Structure formats: C-alpha cells, structure tokens
C-alpha cells in the first residue's frame, strides 16, 4: 500500500491493555467487548465452569480450572471502523513481569476497578507503569450491579492514591438492587438499567440537564442525590481535556457492570473516540520509529508455548511498530543479524487463530517460532538496523530445584523446561557444581503453574524442592573464582551461561562483599 493508505490503516488501529487487581472483572469486560466486536455470541463468565462456558481470553487449561488469568491473551476485532487489539493481562502479582512487558506493546490502558474495593495494590503498581510510559489511561469502575462504595469516595481515592486527575463521563443512579441507571454526563442523556437481553434504553436531557418528556425517575430520591453530586463534581472537578488524556495526566472515568453488560458499549464508543492511534516507539539509541515509516519493524514482547497442545507449537507475539507486514516477507533479526522469512503468521482470538496475510503498525501478530526468537528481539526491514529499547525483566526472589519424577521421561522433561522458560514466566539456572536445574520466580503461583503445565502439556511430572535462597546477584566472569561458592551463596549460571550467586539473605550477601571487596555484584545484567 502507498504512504497515504498506510497512514489511514495505522490511524484506524487502537491497541490497549486491560489492567486490574485480580477479580475486579477484567476478563468479564473483555468478553463483553468481544460481543460488540461480533467475535463471540455469548460471553462466558469465569464462574460458569459447570456449563462449560469459559472466558474466551482464559484459554489455558489451568485458567479454566482455577478461574484466574495467568497469561496475557491477545484478541482482535473490528468495530465502528476501527481495528481493535485487546491485550487481556494477568491480574495476579506473580505474573506482573508478563503484564509489564505487555504494557510496552500498547498505546493505552483500560484500568478496571471493583466498585466495592476501590484502588487495590496490583492496580496501583500497574498504573504506575502506565504513568511511567506516559500512556493514556481510561478507567472503568465495575460491578455496579452489586452494592459498592460511594462514587464520590471512589473518584476521590482515584485522584488521591494514584495522583491523576479524573473526569466522570457518567455517574451511577443507585447501586446493587437499587441500580436505576447511569447519568451520562458527556453524552447528555440517561441510560436506564435494563437486563442484558432488553438492550439499551436512553432518556435525552435538555439544556438544563432535565429529562425531556416523561421522567420515570422523578420520584426516586436517589436521582435527586445524583443531580446534587453531579453539580458538585462539575463545579469542583477537573474539566474534560483531550490533551491531558493523551498525555496520561487525566483519566476519563466510566461506571458500569461488565457482568450484566451495562455501560460497556457507552464506554467502548467513547474509548474509540478518544484513545490514541499507534504512537512512535523508542529505540535503544534514544531515537524514535514513527508508525508510518515505510520500512517494517517490530519487537517480540511475549513467547507462548502450546497454544495448540496437539501440535506443541510456539508463538512469538510481535507488536508492529512501523510499516506493513506481508506474509512471506524477509526480515532481519537484530540480535543475530540473520535474515528470516516470515511465512507462518497468525492473528488471534485467545487460543483460536487464523492465517494472517497483512498487518500494519499498531497490530499484534503471531509468528510460529522454531527457536529463532527471544523475548525482547527486534525485527526489521531496510538498510538501517532497528533495536527497540529493552523490555523489563524482574530479578527472581524465590528459587526451587526441579527434577523429573520419572527418570525415564528425561526427554519430555528437558523439552518442557526449555519451552516454558522461553516464555519468561520463570527463570532457569544451573548449579555450577552439580548441574541441577534451579527455577527462579517472583511469586509462588508461577511455580504452581509451571508444575501443572509440565504435567498437563508435556506429560512430565516434576519434583519441586524449595530453596532458602532469596537474592540473585550476577558477577563478572573475569572476577569469578568457583571457591567463592558455599551453601549460603550458591554459584549458578543463567541461560546465557553468565555466572551469578544466589544468597540466602542480605546478611549472606554483605558477608560475601566484606570478604571479597573488589568483586562487583549486580542485581541485573
């Protein structure tokens, strides 16, 4: 396509992540958005296991069994003239590294908050990452169908705890069993609360904010309270400011109930209107790659094994940063300088997919990987090499020895470990002295998921033995003496063969540094 066609296609892309604390309803709202995109006919809720209706975005076996998201899912659909790329992220803190990497691949974020709980720890952490990147944040306060905290308390907490201005796009008229509707401040109307199969019902407002014609809410005391609250926030709150939204300084706030699909369409319509088109991406040398640049470029932010367990495949997820992708094109892999032909490409609906012929900047595509790619790799066309900035990597704080339960199944054991480690959910180390495999993780749940997937996907039961070590520190190979190792500071090597010590605690680390004052230890490579 020519430059003008490329620019138009790129401008129609909207790529965002949904972030929240566990159980705020993130996966449920994702399902409802897919309904509007015509991708699914019925939203499966996480709770509906007996009926077999699992959330479309929770595709992994362990997610279906436990009702949690443990991996980022990618879903695409067309709606109102836009191509929407949604990345549904794990809410559980043990999988925050996967979520952080995902946030590097999006142009905006939707923050889902439970109306009964307000801002929770994981929400705050993920918000801060978005803030650091300066990406726009849209807020959906969920679960209006249940009793929750006062709306004024929730918006005040949003501003106080997160330090961001907010603008209420709508305001709840009641909550729980007393929910009557939403006062749509921005669209100047009232959206009545109806059951999902009844569809939307609106009452238009006149210039004074009064309902035109018959007012079914005139005798409701809650409605009078809502009018007073709206007068208060319009007088004392922030004004709607598109420029501040684009800079991530102001968050538009929407109320609704994802479970009953109430207020979700209103949110989606407004989001697509004000969310940013694909932005430029920074490279490691500090320059930026514009999305309408003719040459193709992108980076791999995720690798997922066994999305189709029948084929034991691996998919590398790519955020396209510039230009146009065509199936069968040749690209350079920046890390090796090697030229690769991208003949097997796919687009996603969580675990289902279809062959992808073309895509443009802003899109998320999948490449079948035979072992060429690593998380953080840059790929590009053209004469000038492109290397995008590094993706975040967490230093593990928990460690376990892992061995095969059945020594006769060493082949599947090794294959499983290598593939799952390449996804980046756990880190792999090997003892210098014994060659034992040691796994490192940020949280306990990562180990549980690893153990489950080894048995479920590779038919390899494993024995996990907890270790008392808590701190990982790398050492320059030239300064290394294997005699430095002891039970309290265990010498291991990472996947790249670089040496590091695992310390039991800060005291053990200080003791080591006092004994070897000239040795330089680093927390990350």
From Swiss-Prot:
Increases the formation of ribosomal termination complexes and stimulates activities of RF-1 and RF-2. It binds guanine nucleotides and has strong preference for UGA stop codons. It may interact directly with the ribosome. The stimulation of RF-1 and RF-2 is significantly reduced by GTP and GDP, but not by GMP. Residues 11-279 form the tr-type G domain. GO terms for molecular function: GTP binding; GTPase activity; translation release factor activity, codon nonspecific; translation release factor activity, codon specific. Keywords: Cytoplasm, GTP-binding, Nucleotide-binding, Protein biosynthesis. Coiled coil: none annotated. Belongs to the TRAFAC class translation factor GTPase superfamily. Classic translation factor GTPase family. PrfC subfamily. It is found in: Cytoplasm. One of its GO terms (biological process) is regulation of translational termination. It comes from Ligilactobacillus salivarius (strain UCC118). InterPro entries: EF-G-like_DII, EFG_III/V, G_TR_CS, P-loop_NTPase, PrfC, RF3_C, RF3_dom_3_sf, RF3_GTP-bd. GO terms for cellular component: cytosol. GTP binds at residues 20-27, 88-92, 142-145. This is Peptide chain release factor 3.
């Amino acid at each position: 396509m020519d430059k003008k066609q490329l620019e138009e296609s790129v401008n129609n892309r909207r790529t965002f992540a949904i972030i929240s604390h566990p159980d705020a309803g993130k996966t449920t709202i994702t399902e409802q958005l897919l309904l509007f995109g015509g991708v699914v006919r019925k939203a499966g809720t996480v709770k509906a296991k007996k009926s077999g209706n699992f959330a479309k975005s929770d595709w992994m076996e362990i997610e279906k069994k436990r009702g949690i998201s443990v991996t980022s899912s990618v879903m695409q659909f067309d709606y109102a003239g836009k191509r929407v790329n949604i990345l549904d992220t794990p809410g559980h803190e043990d999988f925050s590294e996967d979520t952080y990497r995902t946030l590097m691949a999006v142009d905006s974020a939707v923050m889902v908050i439970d109306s009964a709980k307000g801002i929770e720890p994981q929400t705050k952490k993920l918000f801060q990452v978005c803030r650091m990147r300066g990406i726009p944040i849209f807020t959906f306060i969920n679960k209006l169908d249940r009793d929750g905290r006062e709306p004024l308390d929730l918006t005040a907490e949003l501003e106080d705890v997160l330090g961001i201005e907010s603008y209420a796009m709508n305001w709840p008229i009641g909550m729980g069993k007393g929910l009557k509707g939403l006062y749509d401040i921005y669209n100047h109307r009232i959206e009545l609360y109806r059951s999902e199969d009844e569809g939307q019902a609106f009452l238009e407002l006149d210039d004074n904010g009064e309902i035109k014609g018959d007012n079914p809410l005139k005798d409701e005391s809650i409605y009078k309270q809502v009018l007073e609250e709206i007068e208060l926030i319009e007088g004392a709150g922030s004004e709607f400011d598109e420029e501040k939204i684009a800079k991530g300084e102001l968050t538009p706030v929407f109320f609704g109930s994802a479970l009953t699909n109430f207020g979700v369409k209103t949110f989606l319509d407004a989001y697509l209107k004000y969310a940013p088109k694909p932005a430029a991406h920074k490279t490691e040398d500090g320059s930026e790659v514009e999305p309408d640049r003719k040459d193709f470029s992108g980076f791999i932010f995720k690798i997922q094994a066994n999305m189709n367990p029948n084929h034991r495949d691996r998919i590398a997820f790519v955020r396209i940063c510039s230009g146009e992708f065509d199936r069968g094109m040749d690209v350079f892999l920046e890390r090796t300088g090697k030229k690769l032909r991208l003949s097997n490409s796919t687009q996603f609906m969580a675990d289902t997919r279809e062959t992808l012929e073309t895509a443009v900047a802003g899109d998320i595509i999948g490449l079948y990987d035979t072992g060429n790619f690593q998380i953080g790799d840059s790929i590009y066309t053209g004469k000038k090499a492109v290397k995008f900035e590094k993706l975040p990597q967490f230093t593990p704080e928990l460690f376990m020895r892992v061995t095969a339960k059945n020594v006769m199944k060493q082949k599947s054991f090794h294959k499983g470990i290598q593939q799952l480690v390449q996804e980046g959910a756990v880190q792999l180390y090997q003892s210098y002295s014994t060659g034992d495999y040691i796994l490192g993780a940020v949280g306990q749940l990562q180990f549980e998921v690893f153990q489950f997937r080894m048995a479920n996907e590779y038919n390899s039961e494993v024995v996990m033995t907890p270790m008392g070590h808590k701190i990982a520190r790398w050492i320059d190979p030239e300064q290394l003496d294997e005699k430095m190792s002891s039970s309290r500071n265990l010498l291991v090597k990472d996947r790249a063969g670089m040496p590091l010590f695992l310390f039991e605690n800060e005291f053990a680390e200080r003791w080591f540094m006092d004994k070897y004052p000239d040795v330089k230890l680093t927390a990350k490579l």
